[in-house]
Amino acid sequence: MATPKTEQGTYTAVVLDFETGGLDCTRCACTQIAMQAVRLDTFEVLGRYANYIAPYDRQPLGGAPKRKVLKTRREIEQESVSETMDYEAAALNYTDITMELLRTRGIPLKQVVAEVIDFARKHTLSKGPRYKPVLIGQNIPFDVGFLQQMMAYAGLQKEFAQVFAGTTDFYGNFQPHYLDTIDLARLCLAADPQVTSYKLELVAERLGIELDDAHDADADVTATREVAALCSRRMRQDGDTDVSQQRTPKTRDHFKI
């Protein structure tokens, strides 16, 4: 009996970075998003996306139904006043993003979310759940929190789960699969005594990667992609961890006599 042929599909990833109005995704706004879609076999860039996000208001995200109570007209009017998401001065200064820039160049949040969904769908190259793109980022759990906030605010959690690789957690929430370049860098550089921090700019410098305009989402995505690509190539070279990229003997140090 002939062995059934298996088609080798193409795995992809979306390299992601946010700039935000603070560190807490439950109350702070997204201010800028950047993405690059890549093939995981060659790290060829398939597409790019970057936008500022217009200021938006805080929204209720469900929870247990509340008991109805009678309210005065004044109370109703006060509740109708929207509460803006937090845009902390320190965060805006850190990223060199102003509220005026967001008002004039920012895209409405729901439009951005729809474009993120379309971006992931467009750059999925093979059919089947295992070929949905994974996320790649530097300290990516931070970005995932803000990505989940955006999806919830736009009401597109279902579509989010349809286009990205991931699983449903104990509480029924979709958790996207991701690769953190901090972990990839540790795999490659943990034995390097000159590496004492895994901040993006320091890892990029150690690996010989040029980082332009740090703390800009688009520039950070490019550097993150290059870090992931370089770490991947080294791990594919039978354990070559030398920064100079020279071949090292396969014999492990602790086996040498």
Please place each PLM-identified region on the residue numbering.
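Acidic two-metal-ion nuclease catalytic site recognized across multiple nuclease folds
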Residues: 1-7, 204-206, 215-218, 222-257
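Conserved non-catalytic scaffold segment of RNase H-like nuclease domains
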Residues: 2-141, 215
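Short, glycine/acidic-enriched loop or turn micro-motifs at the edges of active sites
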Residues: 20-22, 183, 223
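Glycine-rich, phosphate-binding/catalytic loops in enzymes
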Residues: 30-34, 151-155, 223
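Substrate-recognition/cap helix-loop segment adjacent to the acidic, metal-dependent catalytic center
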Residues: 142-176
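Short alpha-helix plus adjacent loop in nuclease-associated cores
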Residues: 166-193
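Pyridoxal 5′-phosphate
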Residues: 200
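Conserved nucleotide-sugar donor-binding catalytic segment
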Residues: 209-211
